[in-house]
Amino acid sequence: MGPLSAPPCTQHITWKGLLLTASLLNFWNLPTTAQVIIEAKPPKVSEGKDVLLLVHNLPQNLTGYIWYKGQMTDLYHYITSYVVHGQIIYGPAYSGRETVYSNASLLIQNVTQEDAGSYTLHIIKRGDGTGGVTGYFTVTLYSETPKPSISSSNLNPREVMEAVRLICDPETPDASYLWLLNGQNLPMTHRLQLSKTNRTLYLFGVTKYIAGPYECEIRNPVSASRSDPVTLNLLPKLPMPYITINNLNPREKKDVLAFTCEPKSRNYTYIWWLNGQSLPVSPRVKRPIENRILILPSVTRNETGPYQCEIRDRYGGIRSNPVTLNVLYGPDLPRIYPSFTYYRSGENLDLSCFADSNPPAEYSWTINGKFQLSGQKLFIPQITTNHSGLYACSVRNSATGKEISKSMIVKVSETASPQVTYAGPNTWFQEILLL
């Protein structure tokens, strides 16, 4: 590759232009009508290729010129020089791949990462007492883009129901990413969204129109590579299952329950869930007809749910909305508070009765078998010995038809009165409280 065979100029950088376009230091003492121009051909180069730093508008009466690697013009960074009449001198920075031409252009062959960076050209003019003109030029090196591949979070998404994340691999510095669908640029749709770097493509609610094929392309200024196409295997949408049940208000340990998972299909398998856990195998649980029906011969208050059923195919499944039972139970044996039975005349009697029950139980009180009142509390102020007797709290659940009572004996004693006795002369009277 030589300066005479270079293509037409596509990038010109003058000593003045270097400061603006590449932020490079420069100075010159040539007339403005004869500014030297350096042109990189090609303007962007990839590793393993050749690049020519082509110099234009050289001044007359040159003695020679020197190329340096970097911006320091010392012996260590000296690449090569050209002296008028054809003498070429190589320096310590010469790698064997640089060629200098009589027009000051520098050819670098088979460039590597070490060749990237700035270069300094020092031009020496005959009779120039200032030492010549020095300018700088920067070579940016790009790698060939690798062939990309597409990774997917889910190659078998449910139609409309599931989202998919596509990633263009590998992550490549100084490169841009482009996605194509059916060989065309991505359509404008709310179902497709790109990440900030364009490397990741999100598909929301995949439909047959955006199932693929997808391709991704990695580009940099010197090359572009495209992946193999990827097409999503769009699965049919699973129907939302639901539970039917013969009784939502069963009586504890009495009623038989039958849950059915709908819809019915031989293409699905059925799974039952209780409290978010797969229902364990138990002698109490019957599952006839391919597990679609769940039978509980009896149910307790601890098995209210929630219950869910799931339908599955070989790719995945979907659960129903939860169903919670209203288990009717009780009343259990009531409890009376406080439980002590001895009182004195004049005290207040304040009793409360509690029993576990669903729905809440109905309460009533009797004394010695005679009905007193309805409710959980029994309050009698300033009781007397006439209030001694058998107190009973009865509880009843109209939904279960169960009734049960609890009784206790209350004993009320007389309050003792003070007794006065004479203890003799010059003594105090004493009050003795007889218990």
Curated annotation (Swiss-Prot):
Annotated Ig-like C2-type domain residues: 148-233, 241-326, 334-405
Glycosylation sites: N61, N103, N110, N198, N267, N302, N386
SUPFAM superfamilies with a match to the protein in the record: Immunoglobulin
Keyword Signal: yes
Compartment list: Secreted
Motif (Cell attachment site): 126-128
One cellular component (GO) term of this entry: extracellular region
Keywords, sorted A to Z: Disulfide bond, Glycoprotein, Immunoglobulin domain, Repeat, Secreted, Signal
Disulphide linkage map: C168-C216, C261-C309, C353-C393
InterPro entries noted in UniProt: CEA_cell_adhesion, Ig-like_dom, Ig-like_dom_sf, Ig-like_fold, Ig_sub, Ig_sub2, Ig_V-set
Keyword flag Ligase: no
Pfam families: Ig_2, Ig_3, V-set
GO biological process, any: female pregnancy
Domain Ig-like V-type, residue spans: 35-143
Residues spanning the signal sequence: 1-34
PANTHER family, per the entry: CARCINOEMBRYONIC ANTIGEN-RELATED CELL ADHESION MOLECULE 19, PREGNANCY-SPECIFIC BETA-1-GLYCOPROTEIN 4-RELATED
Similarity comment: family membership: Belongs to the immunoglobulin superfamily. CEA family.
The protein's name in its UniProt record: Pregnancy-specific beta-1-glycoprotein 6
Species: Homo sapiens (Human)
